[in-house]
Structures are given as structure tokens and as C-alpha cells.
Amino acid sequence: MELKDYIATIENYPKEGVVFRDISPLMADGNAYNYAATEIVQYARDKEIDMVVGPEARGFIIGCPVAFALGVGFAPVRKPGKLPREVIEATYEKEYGTDTLTMHSDSIKPGQRVLIVDDLLATGGTIAATIELVEKMGGVVVGCAFLIELDELKGREKIGNYDYKVLMHY
């Protein structure tokens, strides 16, 4: 299946000069959505995953069906003020300024094998902060999976030596 057929390209969104890759058409097609999730599940099967972690909001959309198929739990990564219990934080650099991500402080147990799933790998800031959060709790990141990588933004450099899978490159 050619997954790029299910990605809408929107010029100058959310601001001038940006090309937005919209996964909504992929999610709206049951066969394409299932195919994408299954590709990530197949990547993860031999990694002995204990937990899937996904950053809001589209990491939830991809990560939850993957966790379900693997028979493991899902832990959300959110912006500050969105989780009701004690959290840990990781701050990362963006193009203009910084941003912070949080997780419940008991989301990951020491030694748990974690797969991080998100829709898009762009600059790598979100994935780097998510890796930091997992490792602060003693988790072991055994892989990262993305629907899309924007190659020119070089986000893979922030992943370093972590194993990862990308379904589509732009």
C-alpha cells in the first residue's frame, strides 16, 4: 500500500512557508490506518516491548492501536498542566524558544522496554524530550516509530543511536 496517497499536503499552514503533512485522510481510511499501525507493530514485535509511549496528540492516535495490538500499556506525554498527578518534565529547544513535555512520574517502571511512537519526526525536539522522560524513570528505549519523517529537518540526528522506523519520507 502506498501510504503517501493518504497524506494531504497543505501549503503555508500553520504559517507562511510551512508545508503541513496532514494524516487525517490516513486515519479516515480503515485499511490505510490499519496498515500503518500494523507496519509499526511488525517492527516492534521482536523488541519485547513492555510499554508504548506517545506524545500528544497524534502520538496517541498512532501509539494506542500499536499498544493494543502488542498487548501492552500506553503512557501519554503531554504539555504542562494536562496530567492530573505528579509529573516529571523535560524541556527542549524549538526554533524560537523552548517547550516542555511531561509524563506521570510513575508511568514507566525501571527496566521497562519502551517503544516511542509519533506521527512525525521533524526537528527531533519532541522525540529527544520524550526519550529523556522515559530514561529519567529508568525505562529503556528500544525503538522509535514514526509515520512520517521530514528529512531536510534532520530530526534523526536527535535520535542518535536509538533504533527507529519511518513509514514515509518527505
Curated annotation (Swiss-Prot):
| GO BP annotations, alphabetical order | adenine salvage; AMP salvage; purine ribonucleoside salvage
Kindly state which reaction or reactions the protein catalyses.
AMP + diphosphate = 5-phospho-alpha-D-ribose 1-diphosphate + adenine
Q: In which pathway does it act?
A: Purine metabolism; AMP biosynthesis via salvage pathway; AMP from adenine: step 1/1
EC annotation from Swiss-Prot or TrEMBL: 2.4.2.7
State the SUPFAM superfamilies in the record: PRTase-like (SSF53271)
Q: Top enzyme class of this protein?
A: transferase
Any keyword Cytoplasm? yes
One GO MF annotation is: adenine phosphoribosyltransferase activity
What are the entry keywords?
Answer: Cytoplasm, Glycosyltransferase, Purine salvage, Transferase
Q: Which Gene3D superfamilies match?
A: 3.40.50.2020
Q: Please tell me whether the keyword Transferase is annotated for this protein.
A: yes
Q: Can you say where in the cell this protein is located?
A: Cytoplasm
Q: Which GO terms describe its cellular component?
A: cytoplasm
What PANTHER family does the record tag this protein with?
A: ADENINE PHOSPHORIBOSYLTRANSFERASE
Subunit comment? Homodimer.
| Entry similarity comment | Belongs to the purine/pyrimidine phosphoribosyltransferase family.
* Function of the molecule: Catalyzes a salvage reaction resulting in the formation of AMP, that is energically less costly than de novo synthesis.
What HAMAP family does this protein map onto?
Aden_phosphoribosyltr
The protein here is known as Adenine phosphoribosyltransferase
Q: Record the organism.
A: Lactococcus lactis subsp. cremoris (strain MG1363)
